[in-house]
Amino acid sequence: MTQTDSYLLALYDISGIQEYIFATNRMKENVGASRIVGDLMRSQLIKVLKEHESIKVDWQKDMEIELFSNSEFQAEVVFIGGGNALVIYRDHNLCQKVFKEISIKLIEKSYTLTLIAETLEFSYDKTTSYYPLYQELQDTLARKKEEMVRPKPFGALPISAQEHFGGFPITYKDNRSTIQALKEQATESIELEDIIDPPPKKRWAVQINDLKKSPGDDSYIAVIHIDGNGMGEQMKRKLQNLDKNGLSFAEQVKGHRELSLQISQGYKDLVQNVMKTISFEKDILPIRPLIMDGDDLTFLCQADWALPLVVEILKRMESYSGDLSLSACAGIAYVHGHFPFDIAYEIAEVCCKEAKKKRSQNGGQGSYIDFQLVRGSDVSARDVTGRPTNPNNAVLGRYRPYRVSEHEKNGVNTLIECIKQLNEKGTESEMRIPRTKQKLMYQAYLKGTEDAIKAANELLESRGIGDFNETKPWLDAFELADYYEQNLFKSRVVQQ
């Protein structure tokens, strides 16, 4: 094809990721779905592009864009990350072919995920600016995602059997549907990688029992959702500055590549480094990362690991130094192992939004954590958003969401200190306040009456715990007393 000054900027996005991963309570399928999603943009798109000649795909190692200066290239990947892929095409027909081929791959590999793409034609010369084109393309794709109705595969016919969870027709002899089989095959595949590598000589959990403190019982696990604070706005400001400073199209693309890599690799390296500091004897860590999408992280873990693990991750983020500041808010849903994962994820996501809301109300600085302990089965995200917000919350000892700060009054450190005090041992290695007493005190705080709270505080004070001249988050501490491992990063934790 002869060289032309007309190009296509194409932005790809996969829709329905969370629904796809958490569509079942079979953890093996959740793991497989996570691997499939991670592989689609990272590997399958690259494979499709490599099937065509003269396409530059190695954007991470060579930051300089070559499409405009080398007429042999027909397309070039700008970046892949955050669930998106951006490609510039010289050949418009090639753009259509790639979209068709990757869409087919998506159906073959996942069965139900949807690929959304938007293109923008532009003419290139030395005065062309990259950022306005990219921003226009992003806005167009966002509108398209809001308006589109995602197609769904055919369900079971009246004459066909169907699997009980998603209602898809059974297509395998062992009573599995196609989507179930694809996910399980992905779990066992040696070709597909985990979204985050486990620490050396360790493996991530694959079965739900791997996450339980006592395998076989109905103990709690945690679903954790962490989302970066204002990363999109930071990226937007950086790209705007590149444009305002008069940098060329190629220089702006290089800057975008560097920032994208810094976000995705920065978060990934940080989380991996935290995981390496965990002290645990067994080969299988009771953790399973499921989503790593730019600054968006979702994972499952043993319930008592959740709070210390999240606090450590958020603290590491705040101490990160780079062109972009890394900070985040987190939501934790504590649920029984049999609790529906899709609802648990929704609760964790809403908790994260509540944490972000409090961060915004307090000046938009720092990292915050919110959590919900689900005791029954009839619980939804409305139970998080519908919490009372009256001034009595402080009296009741509930300060959620908590700021992750060494100096914040009634921040997460205060909550952790209260939990540690409740878990202190007495002279004969017994609890200073037995769990039975703690449950009674917890009920007193829930009642919210002054007499009940006064009696509970007097009992705490009589055991030498706490100074009750000022209120502390005792209600939240009572809830999490059984779900906090204080030696996760200090001493060896040995489970029988």
Residue ranges and their predicted role:
Residues M1-Q496:
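Regulatory and interdomain segments flanking nucleotide-handling catalytic cores
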